[in-house]
């Protein structure tokens, strides 16, 4: 199975917010709100936004399958950066970087992810563009839902 071609989804997105980095960081790290903000996050067991934390996640998006994975926060620098590794049905890395802007702050999300297990693996192999659209849907809707829920 590992010999089959995989499709990696690379992402590098920037989002402008009209609040300071500190205010944005406070909102982003309210992990007890994640399931309220994002209804497609079916299960989430995170307790803290801190280096060394392991979060078990189950995502059910618009496609007819779920993704189960673990996020390990490897580096967290308050109001600056968080870097994580993902393992499970999705593998790879993700990085969140906050920067000052003329009016407020900028959140940059970079990632390199590949489906490694479950039905997502087959969808990715057979329909790379569908996997990319699903990834984009989660990111785009996630930011929109975050903005609506937090007001930032």
Predicted regions: what they are:
Residues 1-50:
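Hydrophobic ligand-binding cavity/cleft-lining segments
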Residues 4, 45-90, 141-152:
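Glycine-rich portal/gate segments that line the openings of hydrophobic small-molecule binding cavities
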Residues 8-16, 54, 68, 81, ...:
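Intrinsic-disorder/low-complexity, polar/charged segments enriched in Ser/Thr/Lys/Arg/Asp/Glu/Gln
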Residues 18-22, 46-51, 74-79, 97-106:
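A short, structured loop/turn motif at beta-sheet edges
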Residues 24-28, 34, 55, 73, ...:
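Hydrophobic pocket/interface hotspot
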Residues 85-140:
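Beta-strand/loop substructures that line and gate deep hydrophobic ligand-binding cavities in soluble
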């Amino acid at each position: 199975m590992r010999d089959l071609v995989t499709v990696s989804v690379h992402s590098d997105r920037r989002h402008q917010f009209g609040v300071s980095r500190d205010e944005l960081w406070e909102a982003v790290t309210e992990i007890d709100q994640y399931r309220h903000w994002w209804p497609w996050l079916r299960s989430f067991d995170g307790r803290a936004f801190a280096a060394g934390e392991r979060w078990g996640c189950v995502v059910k998006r618009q496609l007819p399958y779920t993704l189960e994975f673990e996020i390990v926060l490897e580096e967290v620098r308050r109001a600056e950066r968080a870097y994580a590794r993902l393992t499970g049905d999705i593998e790879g890395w993700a990085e969140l970087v906050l920067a000052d802007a003329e009016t407020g702050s900028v959140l940059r999300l970079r990632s390199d992810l590949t489906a490694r297990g479950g039905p997502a693996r087959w969808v990715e192999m057979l329909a790379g563009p569908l996997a990319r659209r699903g990834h984009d849907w989660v990111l785009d809707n996630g930011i929109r839902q975050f903005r609506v829920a937090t007001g930032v």
